[in-house]
Amino acid sequence: MRALIKLFANFWLVARVYWSNYKNAGNIVDYDVKDDLDLSTVSKLAKYIDKSYSKFTYTYDGPDELFDSMRFPAQCYYDQFIKGSLRDDCDGFHSSAYHIATKYGYDAYILTYMTSNLIDSHTVLAIRKNNSWYKIDYGRLTTGKTIDDLIKGKNVIAYNLVKFNYKQKRWYIVEG
């Protein structure tokens, strides 16, 4: 049974990227962020992201949306900071955070990991800087030398790292 769940998890992690690109074609692809913030360290970025949680309403995927697509980063940022409220789940919140991080020059990724029970699967912001990895999960900061350090203890059966290509207007898989 575990092998079947792992097979599904790996398939879904790949298919989700393609589905996200298809479903979000035509959405806002780029949007300027406030450039007067001091986000010069990963910890300052994490604190800013934590404060931005007040402009976010967590909404569970409905039965017809379970394991749904990731919206494009600029669209999530626009909803959260320009319209004033982002209604989404973990991938939408961290997609908005990804947009901020990339605009401030960070080597940012969206890290999605699938757990053996599937219910605890999650999406977070990952940043690589100075041979270290940082995970920002709703503003909570974790550090490690590898991606495995960031997800240990989570009973992970599969994960992937994705980036958004602003010129090609699509998510792409970097690892996983």
Which residue ranges define each predicted feature?
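A structural boundary/capping signal
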Residues: M1-G176
